[in-house]
A protein has these predicted regions:
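Alpha/beta-hydrolase active-site loop
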Residues: 164-183
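Mobile cap/lid helix-loop segments that gate and shape the active-site cleft of serine hydrolases
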Residues: 220-253, 259
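C-terminal catalytic histidine-bearing segment of alpha/beta-hydrolase fold enzymes
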Residues: 287-318
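N-terminal secretory signal peptides
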Residues: 1-18, 29-34
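Short substrate-entry loop that stabilizes the transition state in hydrolases
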Residues: 115-118, 124-160
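Conserved alpha/beta-hydrolase "acid-adjacent" motif
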Residues: 270-276, 302
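Short beta-strand/loop motif that positions the catalytic acidic residue
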Residues: 257, 263-265
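N-terminal cap/lid segment of alpha/beta-hydrolase-fold proteins
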Residues: 68-113
Length: 318
């Protein structure tokens, strides 16, 4: 039977909607494609808009009213070991989780507060867990004079909390940002955000919620429908509610981006696509600078070079 899930703005006023038309179509032999609402395509278990909608509301305001509905609750889908303390890092905790109720582990680069405040980078890891290898990737930042905080998120590495797939994790990232910028000796006017893969996705959502000096998402996703079509088992929220996807998709909130941004990606990974271009077009309507750059490497191999490129970008604002 045809999927009955559709966006409210594209619903059919006819009683019974898509489900009723599916039954009628079965009687006359129409193809499944003919049953889809205009502008929608089939994904894995849900319908996906051909063009992601543009939300009029600012993302920060939308987050105040929206609460994700998790139908399945549990830890991150990625198996991982408990976190230790890698070389060059200080293990700290920050108040993440629901309303700051969970103490989550983060790694902070060693630094000494001085009379001159230091620039800082919040770096969000890829995947759905972290480890020493992720910390090694951010070494370039603290070698370049930035204080770096690398947070873990709820449900990762044996910690408390429920994995939500980008939404509640954004709240954790924002809590980590507040923790970092309020440390002694941190320059709030030179406070940056970066991240790789899933962390790049989160860095965009975070930069649409509050202001950073600049952002450098690496290999970021901008369309959550596409992500969860690939990783359907990670969708633990109510897939019948299109708002769940919208609130995880930065492309739907382009004008909300609150700082200059450089999108980075590897030449050997899935290229920038129409969704990235749509995001950039929507961001520019608000007058916020945004650019994209390809660097040599695949999805993981691009990270060291991208970190160096982000340092060059951030140094424009220091």
């Amino acid at each position: 039977m045809a999927d009955t899930r559709i966006l409210p703005s594209q619903s059919n006023p006819e009683e019974g909607g898509v489900k009723r038309r599916a039954l009628l179509a079965g009687a006359v032999g129409l193809t499944a494609a003919a049953l889809l609402p205009a502008g929608m395509v089939h994904a894995e278990g849900f319908l996906m808009p051909e063009v992601p909608p543009l939300e009029k509301e600012d993302y920060a305001e939308a987050r105040k009213r929206f609460h994700t509905n998790l139908l399945r609750k549990g830890p991150s889908p990625e198996k991982s070991e408990p976190l230790g303390t890698p070389a060059g890092a200080k293990r700290v905790t920050y108040p993440g989780g629901p309303d700051g109720s969970i103490e989550l582990i983060a790694w902070l680069s060693h630094y000494e507060p001085t009379g001159k405040p230091k620039p800082a980078v919040l770096f969000l890891h890829g995947g759905n867990a972290t480890g020493d290898g992720h910390w090694e990737l951010v070494k370039g930042y603290w070698e370049a004079g930035f204080v770096v905080l690398h947070p873990s998120f709820r449900g990762e590495n044996g910690q408390e909390g429920n994995y939500s797939g980008f939404y509640d994790e954004t709240a954790d990232a924002l809590a980590a940002a507040t923790y970092l910028e309020n440390l002694p000796g941190i320059d709030k006017n030179r406070f940056f955000i970066a991240g790789h893969s899933n962390g790049g996705t989160l860095s965009l959502l975070a930069a649409m919620t509050r202001k950073f000096r600049a952002a450098a998402p690496i290999s970021a996703g901008v369309n959550s429908w596409r992500y969860f079509a690939r990783f359907e088992r990670e969708a633990r929220f109510d897939e019948e509610n299109p708002k769940e996807f919208i609130m995880r998709s930065s492309v739907c909130f382009g004008p909300s981006l609150k700082c200059p941004t450089l999108l980075l990606r590897g030449t050997e990974e899935r290229p920038f696509d129409a969704d990235h271009q749509l995001l950039m077009d929507r961001v520019k309507t608000a007058g916020t600078p945004i650019d994209a750059k390809l660097l040599p490497g695949n999805h993981n191999g691009v990270v060291p070079g991208a970190v160096q490129e982000s340092i060059k970008f951030f140094n424009q604002f220091t």
